[in-house]
Amino acid sequence: MSEEGFMLAVLKGIPLIQDIRAEGNSRSWIMTIDGHPARGEIFSEAFSISLFLNDLESLPKPCLAYVTLLLAAHPDVHDYAIQLTADGGWLNGYYTTSSSSELIAIEIEKHLALTCILKNVIRNHHKLYSGGV
């Protein structure tokens, strides 16, 4: 089985991941993770999953700087990065293809939890600075 096929089978076996399908080529996928828009891409011996954080309008530079510092300052948060696209901000998590299915599932649960926390931070930051509180 190819590396792409193996990873697709692993991801399809994780209950939180739904609606997974190839996007353009077999090395990238779009999906939902517990209802959150997500995408994945496989590299040599690694893959990334990105969970959608927010559109760019609700992610101004001061908020983006704050969220980035939260990620950088926490000693237990690693292998995550914010990616900005035309769609908005995404939280990328990086994983090795040699990890067990169980470990990948656990790490994706942590990734989802961190995404939810950051979405809440962004929402509160937006309310505070847009006069919504």
Curated annotation (Swiss-Prot):
This is Salmonella pathogenicity island 2 protein C. The gene is spiC. Virulence protein that plays a central role in mammalian macrophage infection, by inhibiting phagosome-lysosome fusion and cellular trafficking. May act by disrupting the function of the mammalian HOOK3 protein, a protein involved in the cellular traffic. The keyword Protein biosynthesis does not apply. Keywords: Cytoplasm, Protein transport, Secreted, Transport, Virulence. GO terms for cellular component: cytoplasm; extracellular region. Its main location: secreted. It comes from the Bacteria.
